[in-house]
Amino acid sequence: MSIRIGIVDDHPVVVGGLAAALDAIDGFEVVDRAGSIREAEGLLARDGLGVVLMDVRLPDGNGLELLARTEGSRRVAVIVISSFETTQYVAAAVRFGAQGFVLKTAPLDEVVEAVRRVATGGSAFSAGQLREGLRGPIRLRPRERDVLRRVLAGQSNDEIAAGLRTSRKTVEKNLSELFRRFGVASRLELGLRAEREAWLEIEPR
């Protein structure tokens, strides 16, 4: 019996290439595709699929947040696929009940092996990914999230202070604490790391 596969990704070239590659594997059949959270919700509730490969960043939301919402109701195993293997992404995938995590740049044989493992009830997380999952996602306090969002928006300390109705000195203290906590020396380093590691994409639960 074929492993029936669904793909959730909003990039037609990615979906087309992945679907063609998997369809060429003996025993694999790509039978459904979704390009948004709305479409993916229906796909995850559908009977007859064995494995869904799901991207994180979608036009109308975040695939990991969808996993959190559907954790107790999904009818299909999910492998998260992403261009980025950040601590936030991997930890959320583990925590919200995905069965694996694979980079989009992984060789096809790695994707095939992940699908086969998951389709037979196994896990497609590496040992390192599971360790990251057990450590959990980076947790920012509400004020840290507010300040960081405004840093990423390019606001000055004075603008952040005005927006948060606090003093410039308090904002500078907040930033100093973030610098110390994450081992960075500037707003630029802080912003680059936050973007790269997706600190703000997954809300704490």
Where are each of the predicted segments found?
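The feature encodes the CheY-like receiver
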Residues: 14, 59
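Recognition helix of helix-turn-helix DNA-binding domains
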Residues: 154-189, 193
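Two-component signal transduction core modules
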Residues: 33, 52, 78-79, 101-102
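Short, flexible helix-to-coil linker/hinge segments that flank and couple to helix-turn-helix
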Residues: 88-148, 199-200
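Acidic catalytic/metal-coordinating carboxylates
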Residues: 35-36, 62-65
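Active-site residues of response regulator receiver
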Residues: 55, 82
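Acidic, metal-coordinating helix/loop segments flanking the phosphotransfer/catalytic sites
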Residues: 33-51
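Short amphipathic alpha-helix used as the core "switch/output" element in two-component signaling
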Residues: 42, 64-75
